[in-house]
UniProtKB/Swiss-Prot annotation:
The lineage of its organism: Bacteria, Pseudomonadati, Pseudomonadota, Gammaproteobacteria, Vibrionales. GO terms for cellular component: plasma membrane; proton-transporting ATP synthase complex. It comes from Vibrio atlanticus (strain LGP32). InterPro entries: ATP_synth_OSCP/delta_N_sf, ATPase_OSCP/d_CS, ATPase_OSCP/dsu. It is found in: Cell inner membrane. This is ATP synthase subunit delta 2. Its main location: membrane.
């Protein structure tokens, strides 16, 4: 968790509530993603870092630059959000604002991102079966990402939010070794 999470939360919540009220959650998610990309561009990121916590002529020029780059890609409401963040010296929270907005959106839509780590790519049948089982257990729609980790001998590790299910062969062997040493 970033140092900016607590600062970003009210902005993310207000953005989420507004987007939900306008029935534009996906549009706002996309626009905030664009804003993050712009804000994390090296030149702009350096300027944001130097303008953190203050509202100066330099920060106004920075806002104008961000708005110019985002022009046509974000709506007037997101432009207003950029201005409010700048006025409060909070442009540095853009990434955390986006992450929190995404979490609120996923919670509202009952979606959970799941990372499945294995030693090799799962087959489509395995993905389908695992997705169905996880959706039943978690009572949410699963958005699965597969990660290949050559250090796993076999099995899989599933991460869904704060929950980790470690079904890797490495962990099973370590448990067995621990049980044998305990005897």
């Amino acid at each position: 968790m970033s140092d900016y999470t607590n600062i970003a939360h009210p902005y993310a919540k207000a953005s989420f509530d507004f987007a939900l009220g306008e029935n534009k959650l996906q549009e706002w998610h996309s626009m905030l993603s664009i804003l993050v990309t712009v804000a994390e561009e090296e030149t702009i990121a350096k300027q944001i870092s130097s303008a953190e916590g203050v509202h100066t002529q330099q920060s106004e020029e920075l806002v104008n630059l961000i708005i110019h780059v985002c022009q046509g890609l974000v709506d007037d409401h997101v432009i207003n959000l950029i201005k409010v963040l700048a006025e409060n010296g909070r442009l540095a929270v853009i990434r955390d604002l986006f992450n929190l907005f995404s979490d609120l959106k996923d919670e509202h839509e009952r979606v959970i991102p799941v990372t499945v780590t294995s030693s090799e790519l799962l087959t489509q049948d395995q993905v389908t079966s695992l997705t169905a089982a996880l959706e039943k257990k978690l009572e949410r729609q699963v958005e699965m990402e597969q990660v290949i980790d050559d250090s796993l001998v076999g099995g899989i590790v599933i991460k869904a939010g704060e929950t980790v299910i470690d079904g890797s062969l490495n962990t099973s062997i370590n448990r067995l070794a621990h049980q044998l040493h305990a005897r």
